[in-house]
């Protein structure tokens, strides 16, 4: 199957085949149908990759590629994952059904615009008609970018990047099919429509958030996370925890504004809703029961399997509801990595793993947001395992939930706040400046922020426990 034919088939499978999701000639028609007396949204959507979960399912992906009619596949990974059973099984699966493939293994942990551009250039260099990502969030996000821009070769890099740095345009061509095989219990990227990268010149991170970049298939194999190093398990687990907490406490979808003029411009991050709530709560329950076990005993197969399940579940939750302050404040932290050395990660550069940067401000963030929706913070604390009465006051709820978060950090012995990663009080202005470009525009945050609030949240995060 040629790349152009594959795009054509995907286009026919897209929104235009559904009358309600087809573009309308009048951009205000949908809003008029529901009246003009309300500026917030009135609907939510469930967007998710097909998910296949089970021990050994990596060996099935060759059949999936063959069933797509694909002729030339690009297999993307990083140099560490390339030596794992996950990658070897992925290769074996393709060889079993004689799929032609090539390998790109130059993915950067915590990808940058430059590293993604390198993958994009490779993807454009030959007529690949399908993509497979085997790795953690960095690999999956890089593969999303490679597949998207290879499917839209005339686009500039910032065309699809979200504001304030990019244009957030809709691509002309649908993305060629991507199969994601996660090797960490944390990213959730295998089910989501987002890809994150670093923009060093802005000392911050940004992302692409488009429904079309969600993987065609997520192949979630517990065998692929059994060899996760200790700190990878911790930091990817922190990401799961914050995905679930942020999506569950996000502003409800029907309080988010502005109301979209057309369904195809409804944002990927819609706000909390009844479907995302189910996935986020279940992820929190699993985390409360299995997170510590999965770290303290790497041979605990049940715990690692459950945390991988929580990762995908939280991915479905935040992939539709969204994330807010923890992630928004994390991007300048990881982008401006000081003298932090992350054990169990490549040591060729200063690195603050994404999950650690997200967790660093979590205590301050949820202390700040509790008053906006105390009932949700209460349920979150209870679901994580706290014995807290339903009639608890806001202060008790906030203290209980935040003590749970501190407990994870202390028990795992991670760097204690920003100071533990090499930042000082004098760095707060730089962090605040970088965050102020995007954090105040996070419309699903349960409480609005400004520059002063952002600065105070960073200050409270200098030391956490």
Curated annotation (Swiss-Prot):
GO biological process entries: glutamate catabolic process via 2-hydroxyglutarate
The protein's name: Hydroxyacid-oxoacid transhydrogenase, mitochondrial
Main subcellular localisation: mitochondrion
Function per UniProt: Catalyzes the cofactor-independent reversible oxidation of gamma-hydroxybutyrate (GHB) to succinic semialdehyde (SSA) coupled to reduction of 2-ketoglutarate (2-KG) to D-2-hydroxyglutarate (D-2-HG). L-3-hydroxybutyrate (L-3-OHB) is also a substrate for HOT when using 2-KG as hydrogen acceptor, resulting in the formation of D-2-HG.
Keywords recorded for this protein, A-Z: Mitochondrion, Oxidoreductase, Transit peptide
The EC number(s) this enzyme carries: 1.1.99.24
Any one GO cellular component localisation term in the record: mitochondrion
Ribosomal protein found in the keyword field: no
PROSITE patterns reported in the protein's UniProt record: ADH_IRON_1
Localization of this protein: Mitochondrion
Pfam families: ADH_Fe_C (PF25137), Fe-ADH (PF00465)
Domain of life: Eukaryota
Catalyzed reaction equations: (S)-3-hydroxybutanoate + 2-oxoglutarate = (R)-2-hydroxyglutarate + acetoacetate; 4-hydroxybutanoate + 2-oxoglutarate = (R)-2-hydroxyglutarate + succinate semialdehyde
Organism: Caenorhabditis briggsae
Gene that encodes the chain: hphd-1
Protein family: Belongs to the iron-containing alcohol dehydrogenase family. Hydroxyacid-oxoacid transhydrogenase subfamily.
């Amino acid at each position: 199957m040629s790349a152009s034919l594959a795009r054509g088939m995907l286009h026919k499978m897209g929104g235009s085949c559904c009358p309600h999701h087809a573009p309308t000639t009048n951009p205000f028609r949908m809003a008029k149908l529901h009246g003009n007396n309300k500026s917030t949204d009135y609907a939510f959507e469930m967007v998710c990759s097909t998910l296949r979960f089970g021990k050994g399912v990596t060996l099935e992906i060759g059949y999936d590629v063959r069933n797509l009619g694909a002729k030339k596949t690009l297999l993307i990974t990083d140099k560490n994952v390339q030596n794992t059973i996950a990658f070897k099984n992925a290769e074996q699966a393709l060889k079993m059904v004689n799929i032609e493939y090539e390998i790109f293994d130059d993915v950067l942990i915590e990808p940058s615009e430059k590293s993604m551009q390198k993958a994009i250039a490779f993807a454009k260099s030959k007529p690949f008609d399908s993509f497979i990502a085997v790795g953690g969030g960095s690999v999956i996000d890089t593969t999303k970018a490679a597949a998207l821009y290879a499917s839209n070769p005339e686009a500039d890099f910032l065309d699809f990047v979200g504001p304030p740095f990019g244009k957030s345009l809709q691509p002309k061509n649908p993305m060629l099919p991507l199969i994601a095989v996660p090797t960490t219990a944390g990213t959730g990227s295998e089910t989501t429509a987002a890809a994150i990268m670093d923009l060093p010149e802005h000392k911050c991170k940004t992302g692409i958030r488009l429904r079309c970049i969600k993987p065609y298939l997520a192949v979630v194999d517990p065998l692929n996370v059994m060899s996760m190093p200790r700190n990878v398990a911790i930091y990817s687990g922190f990401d799961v925890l914050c995905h679930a907490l942020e999506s569950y406490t996000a502003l409800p979808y029907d309080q988010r504004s502005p109301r979209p003029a057309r369904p195809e411009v409804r944002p990927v991050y819609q706000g909390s809703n009844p479907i995302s709530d189910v996935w986020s709560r279940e992820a929190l329950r699993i985390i409360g029961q299995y997170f510590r076990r999965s770290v303290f005993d790497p041979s605990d197969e049940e715990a690692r399997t459950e945390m991988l399940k929580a990762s995908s579940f939280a991915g479905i939750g935040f992939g539709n509801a969204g994330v807010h302050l923890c992630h928004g404040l994390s991007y300048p932290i990881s982008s401006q990595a000081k003298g932090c050395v992350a054990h169990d990660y490549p040591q060729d550069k200063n690195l603050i793993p994404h999950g650690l940067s997200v967790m660093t401000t979590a205590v301050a963030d949820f202390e700040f947001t509790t008053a906006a929706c105390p009932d949700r913070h209460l349920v979150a604390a209870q679901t994580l395992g706290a014995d807290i009465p339903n009639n608890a006051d806001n202060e008790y709820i906030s203290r209980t939930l935040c003590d749970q978060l501190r407990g994870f950090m202390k028990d795992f012995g991670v760097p204690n706040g920003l100071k533990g990663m090499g930042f000082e009080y004098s760095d707060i202005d730089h962090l605040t400046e970088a965050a102020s470009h995007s954090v105040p525009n996070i419309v699903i945050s349960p409480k609005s922020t400004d520059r002063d609030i952002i600065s105070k949240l960073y200050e409270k995060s200098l030391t956490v426990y």
